Amino acid sequence: MTTALEEQNAQQAATAGRVVRVIGAVVDVEFPRGELPALYNALTVEVTLESVKKTVVLEVAQHLGDNLIRTIAMAPTDGLVRGAAVTDTARPISVPVGDVVKGHVFNALGDCLDDVSLNNNPEIERWGIHREPPSFDQLEGKTEILETGIKVIDLLTPYVKGGKIGLFGGAGVGKTVLIQEMITRIAREFSGTSVFAGVGERTREGTDLFLEMEEMGVLQDTALVFGQMDEPPGVRMRVALSGLTMAEYFRDVQNQDVLLFIDNIFRFTQAGSEVSTLLGRMPSAVGYQPTLADEMGVLQERITSTKGRSITSLQAVYVPADDYTDPAPATTFAHLDATTELDRSIASKGIYPAVNPLTSTSRILEPAIVGERHYEVSQRVIGILQKNKELQDIIAILGMDELSEEDKITVARARRIERFLGQNFFVAEKFTGLPGSYVPLTDTVDAFERICNGDFDHYPDQAFNGLGGLDDVEAAYKKLTGK
């Protein structure tokens, strides 16, 4: 907690240094002997550019020796000159925490972008963004499913409450839309608190997200933190920690279950690579930083459940050139409890969410956790889809007529299952003209069990397109057949 007295003491203890070198976002600063600031401390320096004064925050990254430190600037360094006075704040970068952050947009430094009255307010509690993960004895050992109401997720890749979920996919397959949908569903169904960290987010996307959430009435339960694409790499590297710190307060102090959305974790890795290069470190595989695994671990280990409360994290992961062996997505895989792969070939069929049911995984899809019936139905669905995939080469060469009657039935059911795994989203209503749908898990299991049993073999494939539950299927069937 930061109080007014602590602020005053910190100002009195502030140490002055001077800038000795500026190379882009890297600033070297000299301090008096014995008064070097600690690693990760925030420093401030006044910059005048075109008669406009601004304060630039620097974060200590390295001690170089000879009373020199190397820092990363959290803002453009235009106008910064050698000899400029630098002040050590004696604390790391901090962000506001508590109910005051809900419904507002912040940058990585904790400055509110939509209500400046919240800035520099001594009555608002602030936490430093560099924190230790919970100790082992604080961790929650119980495993619980997080029901989303999205059929393909709940049935085939169930999410863990308090777990880490990765949304993998190339550009334009629907990662951000799925994240927006999850924010909406959590706010509507659970009245839960969400924190959105936009790492290297496009300004247009951030604006759209803010306006859509405001329109749908879920903004008041969400805090948004953005490190935009045009900002220095230091900002993009720290914004995920800023959002996580806000989420930790809701978990640890208010005892809430929180959802943390990070879009996009690849840009967190990318920013770390840029910072590593600026600091002069030797690059590792494919040009990434040698500290990639360590930096990812520092972030991911803080995202966890403690006794009675949780942070559930949904992380969009851009896959460069759809290459899953790239070190960035490969390093992320190791920390995840569930992976949802969004597939371009499924999106091209007009099926959304474009989740690939054969490559998406969840560690809790086992009978002891989800139950025997759920597990059995999910395996039957996967089996039918896998068999259909194996038959595609035969169909492409010889045609459907060369298949056995049993295989023809399997292919027909697989097509219905594929289409029924699609679902209209609440956030897509204005684009599709169709209302969004929330399908309870029990209804999802019932529906797919009946499809696998052949109860709907006489229904045309079109009756299953982008719908909610079986009631929607039956209504579509009546509309198509006129019965």
Swiss-Prot record:
Catalyzed chemical reaction(s): ATP + H2O + 4 H(+)(in) = ADP + phosphate + 5 H(+)(out)
Ion transport recorded as keyword: yes
Membrane topology designation: Peripheral membrane protein
GO molecular function, one term: ATP binding
Broad EC category: translocase
GO CC terms in record: plasma membrane; proton-transporting ATP synthase complex
Binding site for ATP: 169-176
InterPro entries found in the cross-reference section: AAA+_ATPase, ATP-synt_VA_C, ATP_synth_F1_bsu, ATPase_a/bsu_AS, ATPase_alpha/beta_chains, ATPase_F1/V1/A1_a/bsu_N, ATPase_F1/V1/A1_a/bsu_N_sf, ATPase_F1/V1/A1_a/bsu_nucl-bd
SUPFAM superfamilies cross-referenced by the UniProt entry: C-terminal domain of alpha and beta subunits of F1 ATP synthase (SSF47917), N-terminal domain of alpha and beta subunits of F1 ATP synthase (SSF50615), P-loop containing nucleoside triphosphate hydrolases (SSF52540)
Subunit structure: F-type ATPases have 2 components, CF(1) - the catalytic core - and CF(0) - the membrane proton channel. CF(1) has five subunits: alpha(3), beta(3), gamma(1), delta(1), epsilon(1). CF(0) has three main subunits: a(1), b(2) and c(9-12). The alpha and beta chains form an alternating ring which encloses part of the gamma chain. CF(1) is attached to CF(0) by a central stalk formed by the gamma and epsilon chains, while a peripheral stalk is formed by the delta and b chains.
Protein name stated in the entry: ATP synthase subunit beta
Organism encoding this protein: Corynebacterium glutamicum (strain ATCC 13032 / DSM 20300 / JCM 1318 / BCRC 11384 / CCUG 27702 / LMG 3730 / NBRC 12168 / NCIMB 10025 / NRRL B-2784 / 534)
Gene expressing this chain: atpD
